[in-house]
A protein has these predicted regions:
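A C-terminal functional module that forms or caps the active site or interfaces directly
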Residues: 1-106, 110
Length: 111
């Protein structure tokens, strides 16, 4: 089954790993999809800049699944060097979302 996989690198990271990535490379042009809480923390830390656009991740599994590919296309359109996505919950209800995100993040490495 074919899934959309951006050509841009798409690591799936925990919130603290996203924060560390942005801190370690202040010039990294990254597009992000993170939770509201993580977005606030990054903004309060001064880690969100004009070359780091953010999409707030949907809070429910149904909304996340419904908006996933549109959000990936929007993130790619920003033209960033990397797309950092905060890992969604790993509970069984989110299994399909996690599978689709994993495919989107990994497929480009098979080329």
């Amino acid at each position: 089954k074919s899934h959309y996989a951006p050509k841009t690198k798409v690591p799936l990271l925990a919130a603290d790993a996203i924060e560390a990535t942005l801190r370690n490379d202040e010039h990294l042009a990254a597009a992000l999809m993170v939770t509201k809480a993580t977005q606030k923390k990054l903004a309060d830390s001064g880690l969100l800049t004009s070359d780091r656009p953010v999409i707030t991740a949907p809070e429910t599994e149904a909304a996340y699944a419904h908006e996933l590919y549109d959000n990936l296309h929007r993130l790619v359109a920003f033209g960033a060097d990397v797309i950092l996505i905060e890992c969604p919950p790993t509970c069984p209800d989110w299994a399909a979302v996690n599978d689709r995100l994993g495919r989107a993040a990994a497929e480009k490495d098979k080329a």
